[in-house]
């Protein structure tokens, strides 16, 4: 892995893949992010991020069964790897440390 630093969108994608678990494929991940974050995501950005996270070893994928509903096309399902889980935990720890160190008066 090229370090365990995640960009904001990478973190969101990894967390969403974990949330969707067995239903984590490109379009579903994109729709879930758009719904939860009220933020539009292009299919190209989604695909590029999923590929990049898989190349980094943070995700793994498998092809699902072909269905007539999709014209025989198979969905590529994603799963967070152990390395991906570790990267998410490290990112969470950094964020929690930062929040813990913000003085109460900073937001008054």
Where in the sequence are the language-model features?
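Amphipathic alpha-helical dimerization/coiled-coil segments
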Residues: 83-108
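Basic amphipathic alpha-helical segments that dock to polyanions
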Residues: 46-53
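Alpha-helical residues within the helix-turn-helix
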Residues: 31, 54-55
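Exposed loop/turn and edge beta-strand positions of beta-sandwich/beta-sheet ligand-binding modules
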Residues: 74
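Beta-hairpin "wing" of winged helix-turn-helix
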Residues: 56-71
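N-terminal helix-turn-helix DNA-binding core of bacterial DNA-binding proteins
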Residues: 4-45
């Amino acid at each position: 892995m090229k370090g365990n630093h995640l960009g904001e969108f990478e973190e969101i994608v990894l967390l969403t893949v974990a949330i969707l678990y067995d239903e984590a494929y490109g379009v579903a991940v994109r729709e879930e992010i758009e719904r939860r974050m009220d933020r539009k995501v292009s299919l190209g950005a989604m695909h590029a991020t999923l590929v990049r996270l898989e190349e980094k070893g943070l995700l793994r994928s498998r092809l699902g069964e072909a269905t007539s509903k999709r014209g025989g096309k198979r969905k590529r399902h994603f799963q967070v790897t152990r390395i991906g889980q570790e990267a998410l935990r490290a990112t969470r720890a950094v964020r929690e440390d930062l929040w813990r160190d913000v003085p109460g008066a900073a937001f008054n």
